[in-house]
Amino acid sequence: MPISSSSSSSTKSMRRAASELERSDSVTSPRFIGRRQSLIEDARKEREAAAAAAEAAEATEQIVFEEEDGKALLNLFFTLRSSKTPALSRSLKVFETFEAKIHHLETRPCRKPRDSLEGLEYFVRCEVHLSDVSTLISSIKRIAEDVKTTKEVKFHWFPKKISELDRCHHLITKFDPDLDQEHPGFTDPVYRQRRKMIGDIAFRYKQGEPIPRVEYTEEEIGTWREVYSTLRDLYTTHACSEHLEAFNLLERHCGYSPENIPQLEDVSRFLRERTGFQLRPVAGLLSARDFLASLAFRVFQCTQYIRHASSPMHSPEPDCVHELLGHVPILADRVFAQFSQNIGLASLGASEEDIEKLSTLYWFTVEFGLCKQGGIVKAYGAGLLSSYGELVHALSDEPERREFDPEAAAIQPYQDQNYQSVYFVSESFTDAKEKLRSYVAGIKRPFSVRFDPYTYSIEVLDNPLKIRGGLESVKDELKMLTDALNVLA
């Protein structure tokens, strides 16, 4: 159900909107004609490649196992009903007969009782001679129900320590100024050399080091000044209150001004004190999986180079204008910072399909999200708050606006060649965070993850003992808060 615009329909408001749209056209520099880079396209290609590989494998396999040195490693599932009293001993006898070496065995109550008979579901990982695989399976089928074999579920590697983000550096290079003839900087050798020099800073960077400073040229500062001055005036009427509050603090404490491009190290320290987020230099657009994994550690991968001077109001790729004006201020809000980290945590070990959906969610929230404040729709997405034209467009009567629903947003077609035709509006950051939490609960992984803010590490919660340990730390925090309430009572 589209959400109607909260702006007045009076003649005065219509004139103002028309004036802003006209100004948008006048301040928008010659537009880069071509696709705008996004995490979604990268995630989609990875998902399609993985699906094709899986289909090819399934077409050639019946009984699924891994072969190693003449042995077959089987992951075997079956169900034994309670009416068959000797079934367990008979099934164990089968494994004994074929001299199967059992590596792992688990049981759980049967999820689907049949004819009022309860039972147990078994998972057995075992090793048996290659020539005995078919006969062993047939023997088990005579005793048990729902017998099937499956591949061991293998998940994509993901960083578990913040230092391992040094391995998350897979760049999407199709819009690189050295490679893309349509890039505004393709015919400018000076710009291309400058980009390479700044990019090398990111390639050499190791997690935990101070971020090296960049001495920006007069031309680069001029590009920054034009965008900064144009957008600063529009923020008072179009940006959400959280962005405005943080932007004022950044001007006071981090050198934000039309005449100065802030240094990432200064901004990173500011964010760390506010929400625990920190910046890390990156040479371009990361792969979706690597970028989202960084968010799980409250690390935002941030470029240091600036767009080409010929196109100050539009860039086909992320640059420091987009990051510093769009992303950084809103990451200074605690609720939004948690929302961003939750997307990152949900991506760890996720399938290619889920990575694509999470990337699309990121697109329609963190990049192009709108929210309600005092009954008025405001912008919080970085893609909006770093683009005069799209910011005016998003809050005009032209696009469709829908209530934020993660299920719908995750599969919504996106626009990477022009302004978005659809935007999603959240009631509040807290509401968006809770809706995301419900959505993430539906992502299929045989484990959950937890971020440890003391060690900057990810704990994989895949057994009751680990979960119990996490609950103990929560219990300690609750006890401390309860004591604090008692002191105030």
Swiss-Prot record:
List, alphabetically, the InterPro entries matched.
Answer: ACT-like_dom_sf, ArAA_hydroxylase, ArAA_hydroxylase_Fe/CU_BS, ArAA_hydroxylase_sf, Aro-AA_hydroxylase_C_sf, Aromatic-AA_hydroxylase_C, Eu_TyrOH_cat, TH_ACT
Which keywords does UniProt give here?
Answer: Catecholamine biosynthesis, Cell projection, Cytoplasm, Iron, Metal-binding, Monooxygenase, Neurotransmitter biosynthesis, Oxidoreductase, Phosphoprotein
Q: Which SUPFAM superfamilies match?
A: ACT-like, Aromatic aminoacid monoxygenases, catalytic and oligomerization domains
Class in the EC hierarchy, top level:
oxidoreductase
Q: Where in the cell is it found?
A: Cytoplasm, Perinuclear region; Cell projection, Axon
Q: Where is this region: Disordered?
A: 1-29
Required co-factor(s) are:
Fe(2+)
List, alphabetically, the PANTHER family matched: AROMATIC AMINO ACID HYDROXYLASE, TYROSINE 3-MONOOXYGENASE
According to its UniProt entry, what is the function of this protein?
Answer: Plays an important role in the physiology of adrenergic neurons.
Name under which the protein is recorded: Tyrosine 3-monooxygenase
